[in-house]
């Protein structure tokens, strides 16, 4: 008798999780470029879409953090590790791993050095090129915040400067070991935003 009751409770708990998941996903349906939505208790904005999915920026900082204590190279940075573990996990718990799309990041420096190459992220920071592309949709914020674009690279004897966005929206370079705001970008599956009529 006890075993059957436990099985029934487990089945009901599973069904409840599935219903919650489905309802959680529906809250994003029908959104389009320029719209905002809430995810991990933060406001996000849809900046664009392509064949891979929907490119979104977190409009609220996750707090102030250093990029890294020693180097401006994104692939080895502490901030990338934080976004790829803690924040990725939180996002996936809310919308499912199938809705968070990996995407290539171009680590070209502000002065045109390609030494750092590219990498693939699921949760990342905006690059300077992306910031320029979507600038008309990104309002000024009251604080400084990180981009993943280095000012230069090790081959120029510069492994500590990285680009940041000022409260006025201008681009500056700062030491990678100073704390600034963290506004991640992600590509989410376009199916998450499709209305039931699509």
Task: Give the location of each predicted region.
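Acidic, low-complexity intrinsically disordered segments
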Residues: 1-10
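Collagenous Gly-X-Y triple-helix signature in extracellular proteins
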Residues: 10, 18-198
